[in-house]
Amino acid sequence: MTAKHLACTAMRAIRTGLVSTAIFQLAVGSSFANGQTATPPSRDNDTATPIKHVIVIIGENRTFDHIFATYVPVKGETVNNLLSEGIIKADGTPGPNFPKAEQKAASDTPPDAFLLSPTTSSLPGSVLPAPINGGPTDSYVKNDSLSLAKQSENGLPADYYAYLVTGGSGLTGKVPDTRIKNVNALPPGPFQLTNGDTFTYNSYAASPVHRFYQMWQQLDCDVSHATASNPSGCDAALFPWVETTVGAGTNGLAQPATFSTEYSPSATITGEGSTSMGFYNVQNGDAPYFKYLADHYAMSDNFHQSVDGGTGANHIMFGHGDAIWFSDGKGNPATPPHNVTVAAGTANAGVVDEVENPNPAAKTNNWYTEDGYGGGSFGAKSYGGGSYTNCSDTTQPGVAPITKYLASLPNPIAPNCEAGHYYLMNNYNPGYFGNGNNAYTDTNANNTVFTIPPSSVPSIGDDLIKNHVSWKYYGDQWNNYVPDPYQLNFNAIGKLTDEYCNICNPFQYDTSIMGNATVRAAHIQDTENLYSDIKAGTLPAVSIVKPSGLVDGHPSSSKLDLFEGFTKKIVDEVKKNPTLWKDTAIFITEDEGGGFYDSGYVQPLDYFGDGTRIPLIVVSPYTKAGHIAHDYADHVSILKFIEANWGVETVSTRSRDNYPNPIATADNPYVPVNSPAIDDLMSLFTFSYQ
């Protein structure tokens, strides 16, 4: 989710007494004809399973293979990963089937438009472009002060704070990451990050591109590639090629004359190299806490990010089961700014083009014409910003190759794009600030024009409110963010640091939640409230938890061990309350794969995704130690579990939670024969086991 951090950096970006939260939050707006306020009965305990509390913890930007490449399951279980496929050996070196993951070079040049699966060739010299370093040279905490670290973040166990002040790269600038052994001569496939003595599990690492059209192209989907085990034909062969030809977008700028896909001191590069191909090795002690949880609880090896691309779009799909679109802010579709001046008369004035165009620019190989998070704003001239697509119109850039591919599948897939709707494919700031003010119409110089108008698309929050099931979104550092809407205290390490993730809160886009002060206060709170609710036993039925940018595990700006620590604190606190623990399920996942390679099957569901596999671990008394579920699932499967458990209807008639549970064959449990289909995650539990 690089865009979150880029945007935020630029921005400088209880229950009480005898009244339950459910009664408080659900009584709002409900009344009898005589004006008396009703108190609807809570349905929190009206469940289909013994689970009365669901906690969803969402980290940042890791694929399944990136973490669990070498995981060996407990006896009686099987797993699909780089090791089991023979792509690598237990020591992380290439295995006998390494060619299955071989990465390729390709060509997409004018007059060709965007190619979903361009003609490929071997990488030069049959080696990867050198992965480039990322993260701080030292640490993000001044003078590596433990005291400052503890003031800045309250979401870690005491023994994890040392990780906040260690792990710097020791490198300066975008150069090959020499901490990686053999960095300039890596074979053309997955490689272990921690393959030497200088790149440890605690090291900050680089972050690869993770945008919509880039990920579609990296997956290299074509039915001519299809096999019995991979009927979608997505062979994931173009990860480094996309990284090095376009990276995280162009914002409409011309390709520099000194541009190169290979590093040299005089060249202009995308700043990534083959970062996408790195993985950790749990057999060598990497990711120890998540391995412990996988060994002692349950895990899926077929869970996916729901949208190709980045953080904002995936959190939106998680919260709504659907994508959101550009509007007039009143529920009517509209056309986003397209080569026009915006914010006229302000410091942010500039010509922007918010419509995606992944067609290669003249005289380039795959340098997208218009694609980016947006340049300038925050007090500077605005430009670029291609992040919307009208995918109902096949004449729009990038649309025809994807819709043609979807139609070519054995079970043709509908794009699910409504006419005249420009869907948000990448990260833009949400339409509301934390204080409930309209962020789209705000003209303060510290704001950004790359903000989506308030949305009317229904969410799981609306669904739960309507059905009298309590819920909260707990955002780490929310209390610091609300009085700091432009996040001027982002990176201000200390008590006021504001690394709350605004684009991660799916409800911050929505008028139904953010436009009502009472509803907003009841449902959007800080993780400080999470810890107190756990301790007091007043947790709502559904809790969604997002760490701050310091501890979310995002590559470059955070580390996986910090997200492990954030997760461990919550798990430990819940287990300290036996009354709560006995009927709780904690879902631990990522918002997306962050652009890292993964070898798992990807099922096309619509125009928006799915994307790569990501981890999903479920911690509950009702899981069997070491169980691995293979049923195909994605973020929206968590909504399906909530809906099935509390008897709640789907979010809307078009949301993905309407898809059936997958049906698969015994010899290929990963591929639904009734596509499009996603699981409700019930197979992760053994309710007769407890």
Predicted segments, located by residue:
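N-terminal secretory signal peptides that target proteins for export/translocation
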Residues: 1-12
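Bacterial N-terminal signal peptides
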Residues: 13-29
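Non-Sec secretion/translocation targeting segments of pathogen effectors
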Residues: 1-2, 26, 30-32
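N-terminal pro-sequences and low-complexity stem/linker regions of secreted or lumenal proteins
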Residues: 33-690
